Amino acid sequence: MQDEALDIFDEKQNPLGVAGKAQAHRLGLWHYAFHCWLYRVVDAGTDVRLLFQQRGPDKALYPGLFDISAAGHYRAGEAVADGVREIEEELGVEIQFGDLVELGTRAEVFEAGNIISREFCRTFLGRTALDPAAFRPAEPEVTALVEVPVADGLAMCAGTWPTARCSGVRHWAGRWRQYESELSLRDLVPRPAAYYLDIFRHVEQASGGLRERADEPPGQ
């Protein structure tokens, strides 16, 4: 398989040229990534959910952990709007770039083994009417799609609750099956809790707000 070509930059986002993805990760070269969080309004004001994907077991970074709804690298020469191809590639649905809300660009550095990933992450928020079973995830790259109620996520990320409920679909024994569980921050790709809290707050605001918060943590 041919190595993907990426535009690379210095730490101040000045362009330096083009490198293969493997080289960029080996040398820790800065490049751009597309991050898109998708949410669904089940019942306005009371039931709003944020979509997470579970990373496949063969992922070089953080296999098995839950991550952004859809994300990936910008290829060399791509424009900002071209990042939406990641949604179709990973989730099997098409979303228009104009329907997304930009949340800003965040620098992320992850290191594992021989990989040094340095990314400028262009982050977006989008609304979907689809529940997890309606997506067509790219298995084995994605092994589960789950929704977390925003009220639960806010409580977990603020440290009020240890876990948040989640429900969706998981690939097991050759097919996609309904799945319900609980997630803690340890189940998510390691980012500051404040990052996830900020995303849940953006969803709460974009959806028009929550009239009430659940007052008991999962399992109670």
Model region roles, listed by residue range:
Residues 104-111, 115-220:
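Nudix hydrolase/Nudix homology domain
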Residues 1-44:
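Acidic, metal-coordinating catalytic segment for phosphate/diphosphate chemistry
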Residues 23-35, 46-90, 160:
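Conserved Nudix-box catalytic region and its N-terminal flanking loop in Nudix hydrolases
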Residues 94-104:
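A short coil-to-beta-strand element that immediately follows conserved catalytic motifs
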Residues 41-48, 113:
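Short, solvent-exposed loop/turn segments that connect beta-strands within catalytic domains
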Residues 4, 32-34, 70, 102, ...:
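Residues that flank catalytic or metal-binding motifs in active/ligand-binding sites
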